[in-house]
Amino acid sequence: MARNSLPTITAGEAGLNRYLDEIRKFPMLEPQEEYMLGKRYAEHGDRDAAHKLVTSHLRLVAKIAMGYRGYGLPIGEVVSEGNVGLMQAVKKFDPERGFRLATYAMWWIKASIQEYILRSWSLVKMGTTANQKRLFFNLRRLKGRIQAIDDGDLKPEHVKEIATKLQVSEEEVISMNRRLHGDASLNAPIKASEGESGQWQDWLVDDHESQEAVLIEQDELETRRRMLAKAMGVLNDRERRIFEARRLAEDPVTLEELSSEFDISRERVRQIEVRAFEKVQEAVQKEALEAARALRVVDA
């Protein structure tokens, strides 16, 4: 997309460290500068402008890519796929819409990386059932949320909690955890430039991006809400009421209360809840898959 080449990652930890050092040299853009560069590329196809937009966001790609280290794939390839998503985002970026490129690009980056993971992981590793796929993409996040130490097998109470949250069996949780175990910790030591040492999480911290990170997080939350609201359109009135009462309320309504409200058994309420969740999840996944496929569409 640009005449200027991007830094490349060579194999091994040393190669990754060199890459991180290189991309830190690219300056971050002020909002007005980003706007003008976006205009130059959108209106005139200015490749130098596009190159500056891409290089100024390579750190964002690296940050996102680090979150996918637990899938057993070469981090260099994960970063490269994220860079493909970033370049697609730059091609589609419209500065007149009023939001920053980072906010827009993060979705393209994540979609590109996730599509690469889906292509790369064998069905033997990932599994073919809906439960296995649900675990594949949610287990690591839930382990972090409940502060489960990732040093081997999960504690029984953690297995039970994850199984309940994802509506899967405890045996499936244990099996998938063993398949995915071995991801690198953000506390793992790395050797930085000029003889300095530190941890992965130290590199990820950048005070200059703190305000932008907050804005990105807010935008991500709002986007998730919009996606959920759209996905819930597939539910009928009863399914929607039960789904909201059981899954979205701060204090979930009991099966007993809902069974009285609809004059049906508690087991029937539970079945409707599970089915509604599956329908919403399927709708969200369909939208995400369509977004991922769009990444492969190259403008003529």
Swiss-Prot record:
The protein's assembly and partners: Interacts with the RNA polymerase core enzyme.
CDD domains: Sigma70_r4
Subcellular location(s) of the protein: Cytoplasm
Protein task: Sigma factors are initiation factors that promote the attachment of RNA polymerase to specific initiation sites and are then released. This sigma factor is involved in regulation of expression of heat shock genes.
Recorded GO CC terms: cytoplasm
GO terms for MF: DNA binding; sigma factor activity
NCBIfam families in the cross-refs: PRK06596.1, rpoH_proteo, sigma70-ECF
Cross-referenced Gene3D superfamilies: 1.20.120.1810, 1.20.140.160
Gene: rpoH
Entry annotated with the keyword Iron: no
Chain segments carrying region Sigma-70 factor domain-2: 53-122
GO biological process: DNA-templated transcription initiation; response to heat
Pfam families for the chain: Sigma70_r1_2, Sigma70_r2, Sigma70_r4
Protein name per the record: RNA polymerase sigma factor RpoH
Residue ranges for the DNA-binding region feature of this UniProt entry: 255-274
Segments of this protein annotated with the region Sigma-70 factor domain-4: 231-282
Keywords assigned: Cytoplasm, DNA-binding, Sigma factor, Stress response, Transcription, Transcription regulation
Superkingdom assignment: Bacteria
Family: Belongs to the sigma-70 factor family. RpoH subfamily.
Positions of short motif Interaction with polymerase core subunit RpoC: 77-80
Lineage of the species this protein comes from: Bacteria, Pseudomonadati, Pseudomonadota, Alphaproteobacteria, Hyphomicrobiales
